[in-house]
């Protein structure tokens, strides 16, 4: 009887030790507060203005405004979805000030 009780307690401990798929620090859903894009499932931590709180947001779709890269891990415009490219101005000053914005285009479709 004791062995069954111990086995049951071990099984319960294992079940409760399994981590929740929803993250507290990483794997954040869209709309949750973030500090860096690495934390978000979408890989885009977005802020509307320099003074606003950053939140996870979906990546930019075709013909939407986008940012190619960020040095800081937080975007004013999210990068494009997979398969799209962000076409626009790219400068060193824009990289530093986080103002290199463009528009998402399908590279395969625009070449045709």
UniProtKB/Swiss-Prot annotation:
Which subcellular locations apply to this protein?
Secreted
Q: Does GTP-binding show up as a keyword for this record?
A: no
Q: Pfam families recorded for this chain?
A: Colipase, Colipase_C
- Keywords from the named record: Digestion, Disulfide bond, Lipid degradation, Lipid metabolism, Secreted, Signal
SUPFAM superfamilies of this UniProt entry?
Answer: Colipase-like
Q: Which GO terms describe its cellular component?
A: extracellular region
Q: Mainly localized where?
A: secreted
Disulfide bonding pattern of the chain: 34-45, 40-56, 44-78, 66-86, 80-104
Q: In which tissues is it expressed?
A: Expressed by the pancreas.
> Which residues does the record annotate as propeptide?
18-22
Give the signal sequence positions.
1-17
Q: Which GO terms describe its molecular function?
A: enzyme activator activity; lipase binding
One Gene Ontology term from the biological process aspect of the record: lipid catabolic process
In which domain of life is the source organism classified?
A: Eukaryota
Q: What does this protein do?
A: Colipase is a cofactor of pancreatic lipase. It allows the lipase to anchor itself to the lipid-water interface. Without colipase the enzyme is washed off by bile salts, which have an inhibitory effect on the lipase.
Q: How does the annotation summarize its subunit structure? A: Forms a 1:1 stoichiometric complex with pancreatic lipase.
Q: Which family does it belong to?
A: Belongs to the colipase family.
Family matches, as PANTHER family: COLIPASE
Name this polypeptide is given: Colipase
Source organism: Canis lupus familiaris
For this protein's source organism, the top of the classification is: Eukaryota, Metazoa, Chordata, Craniata, Vertebrata
Q: State the gene name recorded for this protein.
A: CLPS
